[in-house]
UniProtKB/Swiss-Prot annotation:
Its main location: cytoplasm. Pfam families: AAA_lid_4 (PF17864), RuvB_C (PF05491), RuvB_N (PF05496). InterPro entries: AAA+_ATPase, AAA_lid_4, DNA_helicase_Holl-junc_RuvB, P-loop_NTPase, RuvB-like_N, RuvB_C, WH-like_DNA-bd_sf, WH_DNA-bd_sf. ATP binds at residues 21-22, 63, 66-68, 129-131, 172, 182, 219. GO terms for biological process: DNA recombination; DNA repair. Residues 256-352 are annotated as: Head domain (RuvB-H). It comes from Chlorobium chlorochromatii (strain CaD3). Homohexamer. Forms an RuvA(8)-RuvB(12)-Holliday junction (HJ) complex. HJ DNA is sandwiched between 2 RuvA tetramers; dsDNA enters through RuvA and exits via RuvB. An RuvB hexamer assembles on each DNA strand where it exits the tetramer. Each RuvB hexamer is contacted by two RuvA subunits (via domain III) on 2 adjacent RuvB subunits; this complex drives branch migration. In the full resolvosome a probable DNA-RuvA(4)-RuvB(12)-RuvC(2) complex forms which resolves the HJ. This is Holliday junction branch migration complex subunit RuvB. CDD domains: AAA. The gene is ruvB. GO terms for cellular component: cytoplasm; Holliday junction resolvase complex. Its EC number is 3.6.4.-.
Length: 352
């Protein structure tokens, strides 16, 4: 049975756990050092001037702490925060209700901001730039627009697909911060801290083993920790040992590099079914039985980071590392992507 660890949003229990372990001060936020150092300067300067912080765009793969940092920004600014997500803002009226309820210096956090409808996005432009919105009263021949001033606020947008933001929206963010994957050593510290909050002990080498297979992502590390706790408790053990950690990871089919069943299926399909590529994302999604957006947002970034996959103008291409691990040479006949022993040179540009 396949257990989803990567492409499932946090459930209620996980959300409560994330709230428990969520730091509330910038100095307690682990990792992303350059990003947080810069934000400290911008926040301090805004507070010294008595201004609202410039609008902030937080981008990067899921599970790296974008939502956590949005709440920390509000805490550091001493401001209230209202949170929503792009898909929920399906009408301009929904956004107008949020904007008119903001007080001076408040934070409006929009997760998945790239999924806002274009009409709603355009409604944000004047709000972000001039702190005003236009509201339509009545309809038909008697319709008229009324301009309302709103209090200066800070929009914090989070996205896993910054390339899908329109240029006008992206240009209105004064602060653009990109999240990177975490190093295993830092994830080990995060796991040890989280285990103490969970109320279960963990051996350092067990924490390190889990960290090394967490794809550089704190959310995945915490999910694996909770599953390891389950195995330990069922076995009547009060501390997660390396043996328990290994048992957990093996049962969940998480390998030494953090690849799960779907990662391997994607790479096996590209290497053996499509002879290494290039293959378009639509064809790949149909072949592996996964949503296109999920492949692009969840699986591809790490496969590229791990050196297995490249995106080119013609499609997805497997790398030499991918062939060395996944190639079935009886199918390929010694050819690498149909190039007789050598991989094509590829660029890093986006493909459809």
């Amino acid at each position: 049975m396949r257990i989803e660890l990567l492409n499932t949003p946090p459930d209620a229990a996980e959300s409560r756990f994330e709230e428990q372990i969520r730091p509330i001060r910038m100095e307690d936020f682990a990792g992303q050092q350059r990003l947080t150092d810069n934000l400290k300067v911008f926040i301090s300067a805004a507070k010294m001037r008595g201004d609202a912080l410039d609008h902030v765009l937080l981008s990067g793969p899921p599970g790296l702490g974008k939502t956590t940092l949005a709440y920390i920004i509000a805490s550091e600014m001493g401001s209230s925060i209202k949170a929503t997500s792009g898909p929920l803002l399906d009408k301009a009226g929904n956004l107008a209700g949020l904007l008119t309820g903001l007080q001076k210096g408040d934070i409006l956090f929009i997760d998945e901001i790239h999924r806002m409808p274009p009409m709603v996005e355009e409604y944000l432009y004047s709000a972000m730039e001039d702190f005003r919105i236009d509201i339509m009263l009545d309809s038909g021949p008697s319709a008229r627009a009324v301009q309302l001033r709103i209090e200066p606020f800070t929009l914090v947008g989070a996205t896993t697909r910054s390339g899908l933001l329109t240029s006008p929206l992206r240009a209105r963010f004064g602060i653009n911060s990109r999240f990177d994957y975490y190093e295993p050593e830092l994830l080990t510290r995060i796991i040890i801290r989280a285990s103490s909050i969970l109320g279960i002990g963990i051996e350092p080498d067990a924490a390190a083993e889990i960290a090394g297979r967490s794809r550089g992502t704190p959310r995945i590390a915490n999910r694996l920790l909770r599953r390891a706790r389950d195995f330990a408790q069922v076995d009547g053990i009060s501390t997660i040992t390396r043996t328990i950690a290994m048992k957990t990871l093996e049962c969940l089919e998480i390998d030494e590099e953090g690849l799960d069943e779907m990662d391997k299926k994607i790479m096996d399909t590209i290497v053996n079914k499509f002879s290494g590529g290039p293959v378009g994302i639509a064809s790949l999604a149909v072949s592996v039985g996964e949503e296109r957006d999920t492949i692009e947002e969840v699986y591809e970034p790490y496969l590229i980071q791990a050196g297995y996959l490249a995106r080119t103008t013609r499609g997805r291409v497997a790398t030499r590392k991918a062939f060395s691990r996944f190639a079935d040479h009886t199918l390929l006949g010694g050819n690498f992507g149909g190039h007789k022993g050598s991989l094509p040179l590829f660029d890093e540009s986006e493909a459809d």
